[in-house]
Amino acid sequence: MLKLYHAPMSPNSRRVWITLLEKGLEFELVEVNLDGEQLKPEFLAMNPFHHVPVLEDEGFHIVESIAILDYLEAKYPAPAMLPKDAKDLAIARMVQMVTINELLPSIGPLFPLMLGFPGGDPEKIAQAKQKVSIVLKFFDDVLDDRPYFGSENITLAEPVAGTVIPWLAKADVSLSEFPKLSAWRDSLLARPSWQATEASLEALKARMATRMPQQKPG
Ligand SMILES: N[C@@H](CCC(=O)N[C@@H](CS)C(=O)NCC(=O)O)C(=O)O
């Protein structure tokens, strides 16, 4: 059986978890405590870079969440989660890569806000929100009259972008200017796979508090 080594609070793991659920696959979840378990020799033997997720399939270990999503799509093609049309495939990939290369690196200053911690550098927060708004506009423009990126059905773009964008509301980043993206987010949040994998805000706060001992949740 497929085995997913994950951490409930890791968005990179959650992409894979959601995809396994959306594909209706049987799998075992193995939780890795990122307070050190990832540095143990048994885990490093699977992933020398000490990151979750890792997918194990009959002794074969795959690291890097996007490589895992591609593996699942190739091995379990139904339901299809990557468009076949060239433009639509490019759209799904662009959304994955823009999330990883543009959105995620820009939101660091927003994390404390998302988790309800006070403070933060107002200039850095404003800069982060400006970068985020460029990504949101890009995504809204890329969505056409279909509900998902390049598709009538959920694609591998959704577990990547759709596990980041809903959290932005917690940092007062509104999607009201982006009606297509807002409808897209709402439809994802209603899916059982999103609901089953949502990390608890309290657990995230507790984890963040151990890393930022000088701050208390507001
Ligand atoms: N590029 C990797 C990133 C994985 C990653 O950064 N995982 C984090 C959790 S979100 C992790 O395992 N951190 C613990 C560590 O690096 O020791 C992927 O997409 O799978």
Go through each PLM region and give its residues.
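Phosphate-coordinating loops and pocket residues in cytosolic domains that bind phosphorylated ligands
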Residues: 45, 83, 161, 190, ...
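Catalytic cores of transferase enzymes with a strong primary signal for eukaryotic protein kinases
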Residues: 23, 160, 174-176, 193, ...
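Acidic/histidine-enriched, glycine/proline-rich intrinsically disordered or flexible terminal extensions
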Residues: 200-218
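GST-like fold's C-terminal all-alpha helical module
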Residues: 99-192
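Generic structural signal for helix capping and beta-alpha/helix-loop junctions
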Residues: 37-39, 185, 205-206
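GST-like domain detector, emphasizing the conserved glutathione-binding G-site
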Residues: 1-126, 215-216
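Short, solvent-exposed turn/loop segments enriched in Gly/Ser/Thr/Pro and often Arg
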Residues: 7, 33, 156, 201-204
